[in-house]
A protein has these predicted regions:
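Activation of the activation-loop gatekeeper triad in protein kinase-fold domains
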Residues: 223-227
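ATP-binding pocket architecture of kinase catalytic cores
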Residues: 41-183, 187, 191-198, 216-217
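Juxta-kinase regulatory segment immediately upstream of eukaryotic protein kinase catalytic domains
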Residues: 1-41
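Catalytic-loop of the protein kinase fold
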Residues: 201-203, 208
Length: 227
């Protein structure tokens, strides 16, 4: 097992994670007797979380299983409700959008490992790839998600603005114009709420690090934490 200097995986409860990993392996018929059988590979691309590829030998010993462990970034809960995020993730998985949820532990979750490449900023300028992303995003927007169909945008913006004012220095608040953002949010809400408004399910964080593509099939997968 690849040990990092702070333990099994930093920033999380290693015993809880090992327990869940062993349970996942057991469901697939693999009996893990020694924790050294887990191989931990840090992955790049995530901005607010730490992600790791975890490998272990199958019961036949000639192949390896792979899962992705996502350790939540410190303090990101101020941006969204974690329970709501997990429910959304599970529902998206059932609709075939994104990886399957395999397990949870206090500091993160275990996901199906997607054999695809995380895109780069340069990829987004490729017309073919942009078209594939647009088609996938249309599927995403058309998902029939459970729960009330309420507009969350304005409440979220005001919450984030309040947090920004709380943690920013007076100099930073002035530089970013925080004092006028509240009025601008109200203007946008008024202008965009007139007439019939169709409420849809939105990604809210469509940057290249949250988009993956299978190089062979050209299938696009969207990773979402803020939908």
């Amino acid at each position: 097992m690849a040990i990092k200097k702070n333990g099994f995986i930093p920033s999380c409860d290693p015993e809880e994670l090992k327990k869940v990993l062993k349970a996942v392996a057991s469901e697939w018929g693999d009996m893990i007797k020694d924790m050294e059988e887990f191989d931990v590979v840090p992955l790049k691309g995530a901005l607010t979380n730490e992600v790791f590829q975890i490998n272990w030998p199958t019961k036949h010993g000639d192949l390896h299983q792979k899962v992705l462990v996502r350790v939540y970034g410190e303090g990101v809960e101020v941006f969204f409700n974690r329970d709501d995020e997990i429910r959304t993730f599970e529902c998206m998985s059932k609709h075939g959008q994104g990886p399957r949820l395999l397990g949870r532990f206090p500091d993160g979750r275990i996901e199906e490992f997607i054999h695809a490449r995380t895109l780069s900023a340069a990829d987004l300028r490729d017309p073919e790839i942009s078209s594939l992303i647009a088609a996938k995003l249309r599927e995403f927007h058309n998902l029939d998600m459970p729960g009330p169909k309420d507009v969350l945008l304005w409440k979220r913006l005001r919450t984030w603005l309040s947090l920004s004012k709380k943690f920013c220095s007076p100099e930073a608040a002035k530089e970013f114009g925080l004092d006028i953002l509240g009025d601008e949010i109200s203007i946008l809400e008024k202008e965009l709420s007139q007439g019939y408004q169709e409420i849809g399910f939105c990604h809210n964080d469509l940057q290249y690090g949250n988009i993956m593509m299978d190089e062979e099939t050209r299938v696009i997968t969207l990773i979402s934490n803020y939908a």
